[in-house]
């Protein structure tokens, strides 16, 4: 019997996904352009109480679940319905399993009724997962058609720890083929769009998470980041997200492209509507002591002392920031430079020190990262692509090219040395800033990307995010504003510094980008999650979040 074509396998997956949504949760029709972010609330499918539940913060929900005000089954049902609506509007799910979620919720309610207490800090909280995390009994395809039809027989370590903490899993979200793209498109479900404008990208590779959380189809989402894949979707969807340093959270048991590539690590982290919810996630996971289950995790519990140190400087209005709005390689679009200026001026008016930062060898770092990502000649990703006969998506052709030569072992070792030397040199620059200003540098303010949420197929330059993957610095995304055609005009005297710079700037159209989310990243040193998140939360509060 002949094997099924890749088209048939993809069609079968889409049919199964469609069948997983009950008819009573379906729209009669959906728009193909414009904003859809408010449509779930206007659908008539969600009750007033379900709208209230899904609009609540994760922090609010766990408090009400812990004191018995809310039942897990009611919260889970509300988020299942909203996740189903989100997928119909922006195409953001790979696997949807409301029956498993509701069964898990009922078990949690029975536990609470018997023991009069929650099972853990995330008791009954619905969490959305990027399609890299394994959940026993569900399908993980990671956008490869050749992976379809296989059920997970166990949880990833992070999934297991979240389950132990009381989290409920309801959906796995879309990713781009290979993961190595800051947009989300694949041959299985097609393209995932931005809820605020269907003509714009949701980002990637955790783009399905960004879109799902923006639509409030999960209380918190989990993404991964090897070159901006948490931060870009958070920025493009006006959300908070953290790229923790390698070794802080468990990655064990998750799927990935280029497994065994250990020079630049992919890390896992949350995407949420507030810094408070990001903190809830981090504290809850670290409370489970993940270093006992994943040998790559550093035995480092949540450090309140670090958080308190940042809070003390906040109270004294003595924070010290560096900032830049141009990395010397690609000039950001006007909405992005305005976003950096809003943050700079807001902090300065509040009494803090904000001084310029000179980006150090960012072009070198980006080039090094690209060489590392393609060191195997793209053998790994094309093995999975070719196994089904599906074509490679056009978006990966520059980075993941099967015609690129493989690096030999000496070249890999040399790349690792170059990375380490660059990390040391960047630390030198950090100390030089402190010596020059006479102040401790608390964080750097920088763009996340050169553009606001970008038009489909137009994300070209990864450098603003990728450099901090090379450095392994902690980075938190803070939403700032939205592109405004009335003020974000093209620069009349703009002169490109490179072909890439010219191509990126040529993409800017004030009319097209009007209303697109704008964010910055707050960057701290390696393993500075507590301090950096506290500072990012404060920045958000100053901005009115």
UniProtKB/Swiss-Prot annotation:
EC annotation from Swiss-Prot or TrEMBL: 3.5.1.4
UniProt keyword annotations, A-Z: Hydrolase
The keyword Zinc-finger appears for this protein: no
PROSITE patterns in the cross-refs: AMIDASES
Gene Ontology molecular function: amidase activity
UniProt superkingdom: Eukaryota
Pfam families documented for this protein: Amidase
Active site: 130 (charge relay system), 205 (charge relay system), 229 (acyl-ester intermediate)
Function field: Allows acetamide to be used as a sole carbon or nitrogen source.
Similarity comment text for this entry: Belongs to the amidase family.
Name of the protein in its database record: Acetamidase
Taxonomic source organism: Aspergillus oryzae (strain ATCC 42149 / RIB 40) (Yellow koji mold)
Phylogenetic lineage: Eukaryota, Fungi, Dikarya, Ascomycota, Pezizomycotina
């Amino acid at each position: 019997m002949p094997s099924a074509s890749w088209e048939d396998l993809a069609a079968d997956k889409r049919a199964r996904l469609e069948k997983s949504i009950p008819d009573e949760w379906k729209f009669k029709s959906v728009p193909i352009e414009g904003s859809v972010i408010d449509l779930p609330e206007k659908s008539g499918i969600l009750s007033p109480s379900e709208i209230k539940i899904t609009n609540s913060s994760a922090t609010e929900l766990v408090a009400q679940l812990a004191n018995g005000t809310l039942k897990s089954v009611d919260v889970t049902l509300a988020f299942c319905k909203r996740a189903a609506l989100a997928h119909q509007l922006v195409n953001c799910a790979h696997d949807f399993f409301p029956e498993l979620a509701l069964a898990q919720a009922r078990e949690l309610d029975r536990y609470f009724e018997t023991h009069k207490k929650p099972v853990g800090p995330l008791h009954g909280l619905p969490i959305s997962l990027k399609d890299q995390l394994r959940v026993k009994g569900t399908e993980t395809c990671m956008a490869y058609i050749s992976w379809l039809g296989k059920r997970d027989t166990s949880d990833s370590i992070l999934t297991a720890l979240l389950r132990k903490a009381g989290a409920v899993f309801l959906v796995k979200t879309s990713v781009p083929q290979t993961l190595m793209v800051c947009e989300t498109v694949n041959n299985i479900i097609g393209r995932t769009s931005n809820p605020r404008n269907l003509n714009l990208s949701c980002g990637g590779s955790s783009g399905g998470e960004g879109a799902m959380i923006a639509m409030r189809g999960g209380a918190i989402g989990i993404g991964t980041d090897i070159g901006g894949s948490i931060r870009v979707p958070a920025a493009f969807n006006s959300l908070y997200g953290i790229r923790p340093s390698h070794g802080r959270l468990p990655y064990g048991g998750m799927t990935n492209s280029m497994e065994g590539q250990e020079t630049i690590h992919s890390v896992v982290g949350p995407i949420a509507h507030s810094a408070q919810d990001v903190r809830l996630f981090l504290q809850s996971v670290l409370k489970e002591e993940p270093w006992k289950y994943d040998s790559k995790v550093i035995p480092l519990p949540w450090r309140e002392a670090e958080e308190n140190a940042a809070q003390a400087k906040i109270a004294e209005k003595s924070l010290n920031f560096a900032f830049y709005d141009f990395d010397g390689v690609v000039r950001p679009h006007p909405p992005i430079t305005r976003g950096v200026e809003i943050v700079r001026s807001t902090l300065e008016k509040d009494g803090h020190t904000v001084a310029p930062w000179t980006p150090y060898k960012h072009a070198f770092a980006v080039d090094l990262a690209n060489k590392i990502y393609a060191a195997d000649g793209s053998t790994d990703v094309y093995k999975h692509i070719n196994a089904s006969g599906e074509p490679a998506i056009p978006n990966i052709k520059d980075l993941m090219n099967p015609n690129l030569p493989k690096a030999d072992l000496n070249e890999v070792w040399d790349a690792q040395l170059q990375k380490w030397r660059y990390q040391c040199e960047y630390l030198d620059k950090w100390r030089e800033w402190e010596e020059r200003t006479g102040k401790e540098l608390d964080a750097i303010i920088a763009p996340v990307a050169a553009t606001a949420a970008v038009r489909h197929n137009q994300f070209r330059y990864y450098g603003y995010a990728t450099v901090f993957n090379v450095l392994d610095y902690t980075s938190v995304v803070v939403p700032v504003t939205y592109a405004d055609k009335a003020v974000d005009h093209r620069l009349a005297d703009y002169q490109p510094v490179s072909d890439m710079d010219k191509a990126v700037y040529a993409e800017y159209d004030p009319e097209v980008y009007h209303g697109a989310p704008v964010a910055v990243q707050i960057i701290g040193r390696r393993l500075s999650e507590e301090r950096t998140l506290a500072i990012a939360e404060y920045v958000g509060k100053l901005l009115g979040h």
